[in-house]
Amino acid sequence: MAIYELDGQAPDLPANGNYFIADTAVVIGKVRLLNSASVWFGAVLRGDNEWIEIGEGSNVQDNSTCHTDRGFPLVIGKNCTVGHNVILHGCTLEDGALVGMGSIVMNGARIGRGSIVGAGAVITEGKEYPEHSLIIGSPAKVIRTLTPEQVTAMGSAAKFYALNGPRFKNGLKKIG
């Protein structure tokens, strides 16, 4: 794994070692991972302007990019899932949110608790979405409110990655 200090600021990782950062992920500067957070292959978390926080049990999947601008920290709440090839830039994901593959979430945007951003959606700067929303399109719009059953079911993705992190941390062996 590539973990870098920048200008005297090193990433803040759980002292108990309860996290996973894949060996091809890059974590730079003002990045804080909480317990059971995971950062997967090819993901880049570049905390050179403001803090990036990855909440407890949350995951940033393969080839996703997390970055900030001055005045726009990036906060990923508890038990969130950030799908493959997502760009998060200076935004907030409230607890239990799921961002689908290939989506873009821009500065100042806020995704409500337990919401789903559909694959390929573009969340424009400063947009805020209520909890339990299904958000799709480019530009993204709320198309409906999720049922309680759907909100409960989507938590399984975060749980899967929270369990998969230790599996990879302890069982992955490079053979070539």
Predicted regions and their residues:
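A positional/architectural concept
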Residues: L13-T68
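Glycine-rich hexapeptide-repeat left-handed beta-helix
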Residues: M1-N16, D48, E56, D62-S64, ...
